[in-house]
Amino acid sequence: MSAKKSRILVLDHVSPRGVEVMSAEPSFEIVVKPPMKETELVAEISGFDALVVRSQTKVGRAAIAAAPRLKVIGRAGVGVDNVDVDAATERGVIVMNTPGGNTISTAEHAFSLMLSMARCIPQAHASMRDGKWDRKSFTGVEIYNKTLGIIGLGRIGSEFARRAIAFGMRVLAHDPFTSLSRARSLQVEMVELDDLFARADVITVHMPLSERTKAMVGRDAFAKMKKGVRVINCARGGIVDEAALADALREGKVAAAALDVFEQEPPPADHPLRAFPQVVMTPHLGASTNEAQESVGIEIAEAIRDFLLSGEVHNAVNVPNVDARTLAVIRPWLRLAERLGRGVSQLAPDRVEDLAVSYSGAIGEVNTQPITRLVVKGFLERISGCDVNPVNAMVTAAALGIRIVENRVCALGSYSEILQVSAQRGKDSACMTATFFGSADNPRIVRINDRTVEAAPEGVLLLFANDDRPGIIGHIGTILGHHKINIASMTLSREKLGGPAVTALNLDSEPSAEVLKEVSTHPTIHWVKVVKL
């Protein structure tokens, strides 16, 4: 009797070359169908071991629950927004993606938009299609010898920089998390953001959308730019404030703009940018090339094949690559690791050069790579220009010029096991140390930099440095209470009576900028920071 075949459902017009890779394996049965609505997927998926999608089909909790045989979901592309990763993890389903497969296509598209914008190519083409021969209305500008400003020097930003240098442009970049040595290797000058705004003739954005980058290129930024600047957004809608861009175009501050991504997709018919002839717009085509789609199709097909045949995991976004016995030992540390990395990233200096992950006690005696990878993921996820997962975290860090170091260290005080994360650039650094109190469900941050604290690694952490004086805690409590922000726990760590101190508060909700400003008004409070874990 022949062995039961693994059944693979392939949707969303994944590259035929990718389908060929899987079809070549005689133990696989491949079913190829067009994109499905979730109700259709729920009805279809029950008999399959693997699912391969691009971005059209939404793989939600209901579909995953309806697939008792499902072992792996492959996303032919980078983002996994259309897959309920939490639901997949709960059901023991591995989710894989293809990081990096779209890099060249997106960089080339952004560069094409720059050239089209500079030479008025779309407008001249439209004029010709209307039967005109107008050589006067479409005078452009050269990009040779112009200054380019790149916001975000990750994979795509780096590829854009290489092409710009080949065209004779001077290249500036702002990226707090790319090292100076990495920038030098690309022949790029690293500058502060305001300096980039002031000096650049062309500005292109290649950052992820986050709270920090939302509306990063907005009214204040446009006010700092030189008259006649040109702006490109091929990254994420929302990084460029589109209403502010429309005003800057109307006022003549911005000469032209090119966008492939928008705050709302598709943008409404009355979107203000549609009214400007000097604006080039495309419908989110950054990754839409035959080569990119073929590349990600083959890459995900090979990953699915290897997993189903041997259990080998490539580019998983929701599981560490580790044997079952070790996983049982390290499981409590995995979530803690990601949160420590995330916390340190919010305290660290710009352009970190070294990220050290140190272990003490029994945890240091096992394979700690999965823990370290989650530290790096947590550190990078808010600031890198790509989707970071435990598999690509190390490669992403290397691309940013960040050196990752694992250490085994002596015990800290009476703690039998610790995990310590430290980020450093030159003499500037930030550090968090954590352990478990009694059981695996009771983690605690026990040190921040050189100060002993006791804080739960979850939610919102309010930190401030102060002089040890009476009334400070009352000052903070009054302000937070007035704004209906509850304090869950608090630690005050001082060097000596009346000396420097650091206070850490776990809060039930995030304080606004207004609240932080009120807190910082106390004359003996030197700085205030919010860390979201």
Predicted regions and their residues:
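Rossmann-like adenosine-cofactor binding region
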Residues: T57-I64, P176-P272
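Rossmann-like dinucleotide-binding domain for NAD(H)/NADP(H)
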Residues: R91, V95-M96, R219, K227-L347
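NAD(P)-dependent dehydrogenase/reductase Rossmann-like domain
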Residues: S288-L533
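Phosphate-binding beta-alpha-beta segment of Rossmann-like dinucleotide-binding domains, i.e.
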Residues: R91, T98-T147, R155, E159-R162, ...
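Residues in the short beta-alpha loop(s) of Rossmann-like NAD(P)-binding domains
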Residues: V14, F177, S493
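An N-terminal-biased, well-structured beta-alpha scaffold segment characteristic
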Residues: M1-M96, G218
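Short beta->alpha connector loops at strand-helix junctions that form conserved
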Residues: K33-P34, R54, A76-G77, G92-I104, ...
